[in-house]
């Protein structure tokens, strides 16, 4: 199977996993990116079986609405049973790097609210140590230089992502050459830098379930 077929397989597996738990009042948290888009397409075939969705980005909200799935603001939702999203990297503890699509802050907020965070990815995303994929950091624009200097002190090589503004109006620094042996500790350190909104490490709140698309089918990993 090619990469898109693997993504489709894990997207369908996620739908199959959550469907038995959904009812007419259920609201599903939905992530951002190419794998999440396959999940939206698969979920849309069952839109009569749940109430609606919370989107982690404007792009996701648009795709959900195009499928006729009602989109709710997170502040109006009292509970969220599931959040389903992709990842740029995952280790075996289901600590993730996310944010390649620049939606990391809203993704992290929705993941924090959800009772169960299901990550869907193809097998290439599972790595022994996080950090080969550059770590995205969302930054208040006026703090860009200050934050970059602090990231260098942590051993990283930050690169400004040209031409990208997040849905929150901020910029992204992609931090290269980090060997992330202690993801929870590094997540906290970077988030403590003044001017950082958040970073793409999902370690303090990792995924609960990883559905991994492989040539031999979908594998399920639990934290």
Curated annotation (Swiss-Prot):
A GO molecular-function annotation: ribose-5-phosphate isomerase activity
Protein name as annotated: Ribose-5-phosphate isomerase A
EC number: 5.3.1.6
Binding site for substrate: 32-35, 85-88, 98-101, 125
Gene3D superfamilies (UniProt xref): 3.30.70.260, 3.40.50.1360
HAMAP family hit by this protein: Rib_5P_isom_A
Enzyme class, broadest EC rank: isomerase
GO aspect biological process, one term: D-ribose metabolic process
Bilayer-spanning residue ranges: none
NCBIfam families, alphabetized: PRK00702.1 (NF001924), rpiA (TIGR00021)
Active-site annotation: 107
Catalytic activity: aldehydo-D-ribose 5-phosphate = D-ribulose 5-phosphate
Entry keywords, A to Z: Isomerase
Native organism: Pseudomonas paraeruginosa (strain DSM 24068 / PA7) (Pseudomonas aeruginosa (strain PA7))
Pathway as given in its UniProt record: Carbohydrate degradation; pentose phosphate pathway; D-ribose 5-phosphate from D-ribulose 5-phosphate (non-oxidative stage): step 1/1
Subunit field text: Homodimer.
Function: Catalyzes the reversible conversion of ribose-5-phosphate to ribulose 5-phosphate.
GO cellular component entries: cytosol
Keyword flag Transport: no
InterPro entries, per database record: NagB/RpiA_transferase-like, Ribose5P_isomerase_typA_subgr, Ribose5P_isomerase_type_A
Similarity section: Belongs to the ribose 5-phosphate isomerase family.
């Amino acid at each position: 199977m090619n990469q898109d077929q693997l993504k489709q397989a894990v997207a369908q597996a996620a739908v199959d996993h959550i469907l038995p738990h959904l009812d007419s009042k259920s609201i599903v948290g939905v992530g951002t990116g190419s794998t999440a888009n396959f999940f939206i397409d698969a979920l849309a075939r069952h839109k009569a079986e749940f109430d609606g969705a919370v989107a982690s980005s404007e792009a996701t909200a648009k795709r959900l609405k195009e499928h006729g799935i009602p989109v709710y603001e997170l502040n109006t939702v009292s509970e969220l049973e599931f959040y389903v999203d992709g990842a740029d990297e995952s280790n075996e503890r289901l600590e993730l790097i996310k944010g390649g699509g620049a939606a990391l802050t809203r993704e992290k907020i929705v993941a924090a609210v959800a009772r169960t965070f299901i990550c869907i990815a193809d097998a290439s995303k599972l790595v022994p140590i996080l950090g080969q994929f550059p770590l995205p950091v969302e930054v208040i624009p006026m703090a860009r230089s200050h934050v970059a200097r602090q990231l260098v002190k942590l051993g990283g090589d930050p690169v400004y992502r040209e031409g990208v503004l997040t849905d929150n109006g901020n910029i992204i620094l992609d931090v290269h050459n980090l060997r992330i042996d202690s993801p929870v500790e590094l997540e906290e350190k970077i988030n403590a830098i003044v001017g950082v909104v958040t970073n793409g490490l999902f370690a303090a709140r990792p995924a609960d379930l990883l559905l991994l698309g492989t040539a031999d089918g979908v594998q399920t990993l639990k934290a």
